[in-house]
Amino acid sequence: CSRDRPDVVLMDLIMPVMDGVEATRRIMAESPCAIVVVTADVARHTARVFDAMGYGALDAVDTPVVGGADMRTAAAPLLRKIRNIGWLIGRYGNRPALTPVDKPSPKPSSQRLLVIGASAGGPATLAQLLRDVPLDFPAGIVLVQHVDASFAAGMADWLNDQVLLPVRLVREGERPLPGQILLAGTDDHLHLLADGTLRYTEDPKESLYRPSIDVFFHSVAQHWRGTAVGVLLTGCLLYTSPSPRDRQK
């Protein structure tokens, strides 16, 4: 990496001389570059995956199965993550700018909500951002991370070891309240409903990213009755919103 810096390193976790976690640590300490963990059965190695992400790996995905009936489908998750990282590091140029819109007027309520969306590179950044959030933080916190459902629970456990507030997966029908951090935990989209509860839904089905940060942020802008702050740490092109106005909210 130091002599000929690659665009992306595909890093296995299980290697004979040095495992992927240590290799990631050394690369990021000496010659930082984009790293994606690509290993057989990511769900079985969740703790190690997030250890690698803690050192700077940007994402993780199961190794595509070679020789299957549909190679294109098998390779799609890996190719999608590589493309997403290409946008993140500027390999594919600048993203289209969103059309500026007027900010909506605050709604009269004492309820506060912080929503954070992240994609490639998100776990390590989330840990750093949330590490010093105090136990008496006066707002509910909801995270939407582009992460496969198979290791969402592992991410919640990993974050629990990094931050003060308890972290767990969103339960269907609950409300975001102060004193905890909720993480979207399925391959369906997370929505905030008009009654202030959280729900998982398949719609919109055409979304490339599930759960979609864009879909959740739009539902918060539409339904939250108090003060809400949305933070986009890293992300991908927002394919699913119906308009630039919705994207800006």
Model-derived regions, located:
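A short, hydrophobic C-terminal helix/tail in secreted or cell-surface proteins
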Residues: 242-249
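Conserved acid/base catalytic micro-environments in cytosolic active-site loops
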Residues: 3, 8-10, 14-241
